UniProtKB/Swiss-Prot annotation:
This is Parathyroid hormone. One of its GO terms (cellular component) is extracellular space. Interacts with PTH1R (via N-terminal extracellular domain). Residues 1-25 form the signal peptide. SMART domains: PTH (SM00087). Parathyroid hormone elevates calcium level by dissolving the salts in bone and preventing their renal excretion. Acts by binding to its receptor, PTH1R, activating G protein-coupled receptor signaling. Stimulates [1-14C]-2-deoxy-D-glucose (2DG) transport and glycogen synthesis in osteoblastic cells. The keyword Signal applies. Its main location: secreted. PANTHER family: PARATHYROID HORMONE. One of its GO terms (molecular function) is hormone activity.
Length: 115
């Protein structure tokens, strides 16, 4: 059997463990930012700095290009709209014949002709 002194010591130790462990799985104190979070933030910052530097270089190129008075040309004319109605006509090789037309195209054409 245990003596009363040993029983008191055991009870004090158990009480201390109970008080320290009663945190429901959460840390008793707020933890500081971990090294992983710091590295993540550093990576995002370096990526942001790299993007800003790239954009600054591109804007500097555009500024220099305009400052020289060079005309601006569009690639493939894809972003330009036709200036005249005649420029909007399809090339014969790209036009569909009536046999190749989709059923939806024929329906739309028949509805517009009837009006």
């Amino acid at each position: 059997m245990m003596s009363a002194k040993n029983m008191v010591k055991v009870m004090i130790v158990m009480f201390a463990i109970f008080l320290l462990a009663k945190s429901d799985g959460k840390p008793v104190r707020k933890r500081s930012v971990s090294e992983i979070q710091l590295m993540h933030n550093l990576g995002k910052h370096l990526n942001s700095v790299e993007r800003v530097e790239w954009l600054r270089k591109k804007l500097q190129d555009v500024h220099n290009f305009i400052a020289l008075g060079a005309p601006i040309f569009h690639r493939d004319g894809g972003s330009q709209r036709p200036r005249k109605k005649e420029d909007n006509v399809l090339i014969e090789s790209h036009q569909k014949s009536l046999g190749e037309a989709d059923k939806a195209d024929v329906d739309v054409l028949s509805k517009t002709k009837s009006q």
